[in-house]
Each structure stands twice: as structure tokens, then as C-alpha cells.
Amino acid sequence: MTWMRVMPRCQNRTYKRPRGPPLSIHPLEFFQAKKVEKTAKAKMILYYLASIPLAIICYLAWYLHVPWDLPSLPRIPFYVSILGLWSSMGQDEIYERWLRKPLEAHGAVLIWFAGRWSILVTRPDLLTDMFRNEDLYAKAGSQKKIPWSVIATLVGDNIINSHGDTWKLYTGIMKPGLQKKNFDTAPLLLKSRRFVDEILAEQNSAGRGTGILVNTFVQQWAVDVMGMSFLDLDLQSLEKPHGTVRLEAIQSVIKLMLFRPLFFNFPDLDQFAWLIKSRQRAYEIMHEFGDTLMATVLGRIDSDREKGIKPAEEMVVHMLVDAYRDGRLTEKQFKDNLKIVFLTAHENAQQLVNSMFWEIGKNNEVQTRLRAEILSTNTTTPTSEVVNALPYLTAVVYELLRLYPPVSQLINRVTVRPAMLGNEIPIPAGTFVGWNAYGVHVNPAIWGPDANEFKPERWGRTVGEMHARFRRETVRGTYIPFNAHSRKCLGQGFVLLQMKILLFEVLRRIEWTVDPGYRLKMTPVSYFLESGRKSTDA
């Protein structure tokens, strides 16, 4: 067997190690050493590969841990918040399975929402404490919580989620246009008639007895009514071919992008949008919406002013434009408040109308009684005085808002200093708190054993009794479709009128039932139509 000697590259020199003689290796030993070296490298690679999931697990454990200083409340399992990744369960189903019992027993729970553990409240006295103490439980929307996110890019800093002097500035400018005593009902009736025309045409095209989807028409109606009542714009979404009014068509895209469970519950992922093509597109859509809306509004108003055309009535858009032009609002503040008017003034109505078609479509007794009351007026041109005098119509709208609150859950307040909610729940500063309106409204301890039933009669017999209970339950924190106290929705009067006018026209001209394959799905902030069809027969 031949021996070999491993020498350094430098010729004619003997390589001397610091210790021992020059290295001599037998060929067999050499290959064995190489094998050992490869095995060591393989093990090292395996260790590295194993450390990656371990590091991820450790990071998630840190990211998802409940801060030690949060109150000792029942904790809703983290996975409940991300069920949408693999489950089609609606929020009403999720509430019944995981939230109802702890919330009704304790009044508040810890829940994972928008990238952090927050406190969700449903007990009325706790809600009242939170609503009344605006300086302690300050409004803080996505622009404060997750300012880098897609949703923050969409809504920005606006009259709904701002606080302090900024909120006072916005309210001083916008309140007269949002809380008018006498809204013009002509646009409401005009668009409601067009809406009924469109769904009847769709039904005739589909054939009698065949179900049709109405959500597209509902959104078009809601956008058109919003435009004519708040922005001095007739977008004509109902009149023009579907999808040609960009400001309306883009709303469906926005809704789909906002409520993707992964990004909704892990908004930190939006900070890596440069790696995620779908999030890049989401940011583009949000910017397109804001830029298009601002250009459309200013273009219309400037054109009218150049022609000497004065608006028929002062709307919130005119107040915003004046404040922007005289420097009270920055361009961003102007745009953010335009967007929030557009979004809330159409989406809440849209979701409530979807719920209306669902509930009244499967409740023939209510539909028949309501139609009889409407037809008894002997008019086809209802005014605000006419619809506001109808007790059953009023009760139906109130009950729809109770069982189907358009904003079913919202966590957009933060403690500015350590707090003691209801004098019993200690909350550290910087904790986000919110409410679940659906949970409040279906609590049998508040609304009785029939809390889950659609029962308009619970509101009373006369319009006066109904208004009194509406106010009483709102003050108590037991009825919160429009929030309560100083931050209650400024547009609630308009929403009630809008719904009554639409219901009047729909019930006057249409009878309908719900298609057996249709399903209503409840999302964290509103209701959306889910698979299935709605049958509408004239």
C-alpha cells in the first residue's frame, strides 16, 4: 500500500506545523475524513433548517402573547379571529359558538383584533362608561393603531376616528351638512324608484320563479343616494351600464381587499407590501379611490361655480370644499373626510337593505302587514311626514337595526391613561377597547328570551312610544347601532329616512321571497351577501 504526503503549494520547502511532524494521511483515512466532514456539514444544514421553524414559532409566541398588564378577563382563542382563512362561518355563527357565553357572563373579553390583544365589551353599564368618557377612552382608528396599513390608507384621519381638537374641527365644519333637520326626499324617492325598476327588469329577464341577486343594484342605489344627498353628485350608477361608474364599481374591489382574514388580523404584513403583489395592488386601489373622488368632487363644484350655478341646498361637500379652500383643512384632511362620507353614507345603508331583503323576504307575515300599512296611505309620493307617521314601518326599521346592525363590531378606542372601566376592570394605558353591537342586541338578559327573534312589536304601538324607547335604550347602552352619547352617528336621522322611503317604494311595488340557496354572512364590521340567490317576484 502506497503512502502519500500532503505538502503545501510552495515547492522545495517542508511545511512545518506548530506542533508535530508534517501531516501524512493514508488514502483510506483521507476518504473517511472527507465523509465525516460531509456528515458534519449535513448535520449543520439540518440544524439550520430546524432552527427556522423554531425561530418562527418563538416569534409567533412573542407576537401573540397576552401582555401581562391586561385585565384578567376570559380570552377568546386566537384562532377564532383567523377562522376565515379556512372556514366560511359568519360572525354571527362565530359569536354563538365562542363569544356569547363569556361575554354574557363577564361583560367583556380579551380578543385578538388587527394585530393586538384588545378588550371587547357588551355589558351596557361598561359601554356607557366608555362612551361617556371620551377623554379617557379616546377615538383612535387605523390611522393611529396601524398607520402603515391598507385600511389606514383608505380611511385616513376623519370625523369618525379622530379625537380632541381635530375632531372638533371636523365636526364644526361637517355637522350642519350631516345632521340637517330636513333632508330633501326627492333624490331618495327618485333613486328608490329607479332601483325597483332595475330589479324588476332583472327579474323579468331571469324569468318568474328564478332567483336573482340584488346586491349589485343595492350598492348602486346606495352610492347614488349618497352622492345626491351629501356630495352634490348624481353618479347615475343605476342608470349607466354596470361597472362603468368607477367610483361605484371600485367599492366591491375595496371590500374584498379590506377583509382578507390574513391581512385583517396581521396588519404588520402590510409593511412588507413590496414583497406581496396583492397588497401593492391594494394600495394602488385605495389611492385611486381617493384621487378619483377628490378630482370628481372639485371638478363638479368648480364647473358649477364658473357657470354661476348655485347649489339647490348646502351640503356637507360644499362645507368641506370651503374649509379646504380657505386653509382650515389640509388636502389630506379634505380627502380623508370626503372618503369617509362616501364610504359610510353608502355602505351602512347597503348592508341594512341587504338585511331587509333577507329578513322580510323570509317573514311573510311582516311583509304583508307592512305592505298594508304603506298602501293605506293612498299615495305614491311619500314625504318625510308620511313615512315618519307610520308606526309599523318605524318599528320594522328599528328592529332591523337591532338584529342586523350595519357595524356589528368596532374596536377603535384607546385608553390615554390607566383606566378602571365600570369601576371594576383595570385597563392599562394604550389598550384598545371596543364593542360588539350584535352581542348587546341579542342578549336575552337585556331584550328578553325572544332577543334573537325579529319582532317589530317590541318597540311599542305608537310612533311616540317607539321614539321614546329608541332614545331610552340608546342612553342605557342597550341599543347601539349608531354608537351613543357625544360620538353617536351624525347621519342617523338620514339613514332612518332613507330606509323608510326605500321600504315604502319596495313594499308598494314588489312581493318577494328568499331563494332557498341564499345565505347571509355576517362580517366583523358589516353584513355582506354570500353565495346564493335572492328570489324577487313582482
From Swiss-Prot:
Pathway: Secondary metabolite biosynthesis. The keyword Flavoprotein does not apply. Coiled coil: none annotated. The chain crosses the membrane at residues 44-64. Glycans are attached at N378. CDD domains: CYP56-like (cd11070). Pfam families: p450. Heme binds at C489. Its EC number is 1.14.-.-. One of its GO terms (molecular function) is oxidoreductase activity, acting on paired donors, with incorporation or reduction of molecular oxygen. Its cofactor is heme. PANTHER family: CYTOCHROME P450, CYTOCHROME P450-DIT2. Cytochrome P450 monooxygenase; part of the gene cluster that mediates the biosynthesis of the isocyanide xanthocillin and its derivatives. The first step of the pathway consists in the conversion of tyrosine into a vinyl-isonitrile intermediate by the isocyanide synthase xanB. Subsequent oxidative dimerization of this intermediate to form xanthocillin may involve the cytochrome P450 monooxygenase xanG, whose expression is coregulated with that of XanB. This is Cytochrome P450 monooxygenase xanG. It comes from Aspergillus fumigatus (strain ATCC MYA-4609 / CBS 101355 / FGSC A1100 / Af293).
